[in-house]
């Protein structure tokens, strides 16, 4: 058996939600949408998490803490996002650091989704379900989170400022209905649809 140099036996272990997708979600989706081939079943391609820190223009330390927190939540180093153009009303210059972003794929993506659905979302105050209208028409879903302290990785005593984030779930689904069923089957707690 040949193994890649950097690959450890722990990396071969599949994420819990990834095996759940293959064993449970794929058959449900094939039956519901009458796909002729397993490869036609939509899948989660990536999760993109973005934190916008507009106040970073005046106080750069806020961006550093946001990057540190995003790194703790995702287990991956965030990318700094810079402004594209100057806007005088916001005291913003071109190429000024105003946010950070992380894109998760494969195993880390499934592990994050598992933690998000089972640990973080239940900790949201007055939670009644995620909005089921935040689909973009192309099978992608974006959830806005108001507080980063819902994640267990964040120590509430060390948080200088509460900030929110946008979490985008990019799927290979052709329609919003397929994406809704896919994410709901993966455990996403949506509000009940009004028919």
Curated annotation (Swiss-Prot):
Its keywords, alphabetically, are: Ribonucleoprotein, Ribosomal protein, RNA-binding, rRNA-binding, tRNA-binding
Example GO BP: translation
GO cellular component terms given for this protein: ribonucleoprotein complex; ribosome
InterPro entries (UniProt xref): Ribosomal_uL5, Ribosomal_uL5_bac-type, Ribosomal_uL5_C, Ribosomal_uL5_dom_sf, Ribosomal_uL5_N
Q: Which SUPFAM superfamilies does the UniProt entry name for this protein?
A: RL5-like
- Recall the GO molecular function terms of this protein's record: rRNA binding; structural constituent of ribosome; tRNA binding
What Gene3D superfamilies does this protein map onto?
Answer: 3.30.1440.10
Domain of life, per UniProt, equals Bacteria
Family affiliation: Belongs to the universal ribosomal protein uL5 family.
Instruction: Briefly state the protein's biological role.
Output: This is one of the proteins that bind and probably mediate the attachment of the 5S RNA into the large ribosomal subunit, where it forms part of the central protuberance. In the 70S ribosome it contacts protein S13 of the 30S subunit (bridge B1b), connecting the 2 subunits; this bridge is implicated in subunit movement. Contacts the P site tRNA; the 5S rRNA and some of its associated proteins might help stabilize positioning of ribosome-bound tRNAs.
- Relate the assembly described in the record: Part of the 50S ribosomal subunit; part of the 5S rRNA/L5/L18/L25 subcomplex. Contacts the 5S rRNA and the P site tRNA. Forms a bridge to the 30S subunit in the 70S ribosome.
Query: Any idea what this protein is called?
Result: Large ribosomal subunit protein uL5
What is the species of this protein? Chlorobium phaeobacteroides (strain DSM 266 / SMG 266 / 2430)
